[in-house]
Amino acid sequence: MPLLVEGRRVRLPQSAGDLVRAHPPLEERARLLRGQSVQQVGPQGLLYVQQRELAVTSPKDGSVCILGSDDATTCHIVVLRHTGNGATCLTHCDGTDTKAEVSLIMSSIKSFSDHTQRGRLEVHLVGGFSDDRQLSQKLTHQLLSEFDRQEDDIHLVTLCVTELNDREENENHFPIIYGIAVNVKTAEIYRASFPDRGPEEELRAARVLTGGPMISIYDAKTEQLRIGPYSWMPFPHVDFWLQQDDKQILENLSTSPLAEPPHFVEHIRSTLMFLKKYPSPTNTLFPGNKALLYKKNEDGLWKEISSGGET
């Protein structure tokens, strides 16, 4: 069955703006979310999700209570939740392969869901803006269409994307919301930023920059964050890119150069330096080709434990 709003089938294709105008509760929810102040989320109990990563857990999790992601410009952050058992998935989609990504989101939630349970699947889409290349608009359409193609009823509860998440300044467009968090125990979704994006922020970013697909990074049964093992080819012309000025990096390595957060170029440079240092990560970063495993300690912070077994 399809994507529903207020129990009614969503008529697609239509723009995000037209969709919320047809459903006042959606419009009001987007307005309230945009109007929030940004909360800075500390590392305790947090699982930070990078671009092209997915994490799913439930209120039974004793380690992770907040899932979050930010730095979404043309990207969208997707939260899918089962209201019966509270299983919650957060992912940061960039349009690389939306069909496969939505399929992964659905299967990750279903791995938790006993469908004899009461409750329903609710989806929240946040991110993007009115960018010149219409990448946000395309991603919004892809996500709505793919959720509409699923067998299950999926209730669209939050839609704050593209033109609904846009502000204009000096004739340039920017997102209003760059990041959100979801409290797994209360289901609250709120605007957020994250000073701590670990563990292994550079390693995870390097995987994305070299074209890695969407992956699930967390095992809620063992409450372990699993990183890798990854492999990539040496990044082409890495020395050339490291010699370029900020403007060149922005214009060539961003989908939306004018709308990126201030730390974007620094983040890209550090990721390129990492790729230069580790052109082939398999044995240098993943001894024995085993995953890096992390678990929350008593203070709610990630701590590395012994490497994983199977690859």
Swiss-Prot record:
Record carries keyword Repeat: no
Subunit record text: Monomer.
UniProt function note: N-terminal asparagine deamidase that mediates deamidation of N-terminal asparagine residues to aspartate. Required for the ubiquitin-dependent turnover of intracellular proteins that initiate with Met-Asn. These proteins are acetylated on the retained initiator methionine and can subsequently be modified by the removal of N-acetyl methionine by acylaminoacid hydrolase (AAH). Conversion of the resulting N-terminal asparagine to aspartate by NTAN1/PNAD renders the protein susceptible to arginylation, polyubiquitination and degradation as specified by the N-end rule.
Disulfide bond positions: none
Organism listed in the record: Sus scrofa
Cellular component terms (Gene Ontology): cytoplasm; nucleus
Lineage of source species: Eukaryota, Metazoa, Chordata, Craniata, Vertebrata
Localization per record: Cytoplasm
Name recorded for this polypeptide: Protein N-terminal asparagine amidohydrolase
Alphabetical list of InterPro entries matching this protein: NTAN1 (IPR026750)
Superkingdom as given in the UniProt entry: Eukaryota
Reaction(s) the record says it catalyses: N-terminal L-asparaginyl-[protein] + H2O + H(+) = N-terminal L-aspartyl-[protein] + NH4(+)
Gene Ontology BP terms: adult locomotory behavior; memory; ubiquitin-dependent protein catabolic process
Gene Ontology MF annotations: protein-N-terminal asparagine amidohydrolase activity
Pfam families according to UniProt: N_Asn_amidohyd
PANTHER family: N-TERMINAL ASPARAGINE AMIDOHYDROLASE, PROTEIN N-TERMINAL ASPARAGINE AMIDOHYDROLASE
Keywords from the named record: Cytoplasm, Hydrolase
Protein's UniProt keywords contain Cytoplasm: yes
Leading EC class: hydrolase
EC number annotated for this UniProt entry: 3.5.1.121
